Amino acid sequence: MARGGSDVAETRARLLDTARHLFAERGFEDVTVREICRGAGANLALVNYYFGDKLGLYLEVVNQAIAAVREFNSLAMTAPEGSDAEKRLRLFVRGLLHRVFELRGVDSWVHRLIQHELSRPTELATRILQEAMAPRIRYLAEIVAELLSCPKKDPRVMHCVASVHGLCLVYSRIVLANQFKAAMPDLASDGPFDVEDAVAHVSAFSLAGIRAMRR
């Protein structure tokens, strides 16, 4: 009996959802098609039917991850045309931190999947970096190079890019983490976290550091 359209869509969606979480948890190599199908409650043959093979399923998951990162990037790359470098940096920091703040507590399967690709790369690693990560890094590198008045290949540029980018992302792991307050209550603020305070701090700290690198 032919499968109904809604059944096909639901089964395919379950396979993708299960694959996303398993690939993000353990990486491509350590996950089997059998595990994915068992978790999705689907017949083993359906991975081949819908996606061709395990790599085809992984490619679909990677495409979803790239789309999610592109949306993330768009919030940090919104400076009006003609904005000076300092304003662009502040808007970059604001966009990134607001997105990190919005996503706190949300399952970060995209981040975990990318981390697996960086540590144990598959044939898709370069594509993920080029299409998902590179646009944001290049955008920030252009800002930093302008602030430093140097070519983008100057080693100071990527040092500063890593510092600014890392400082933004660390808030999701320390300042915003419930575990931080539980483990170090003496350092945790009593009041609610204000993302604009973080934006002001990271922007000022980053700009001061970049200015110091010009000397």
PLM regions: where:
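Hydrophobic alpha-helical connector segments
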Residues: 74-109, 157-164
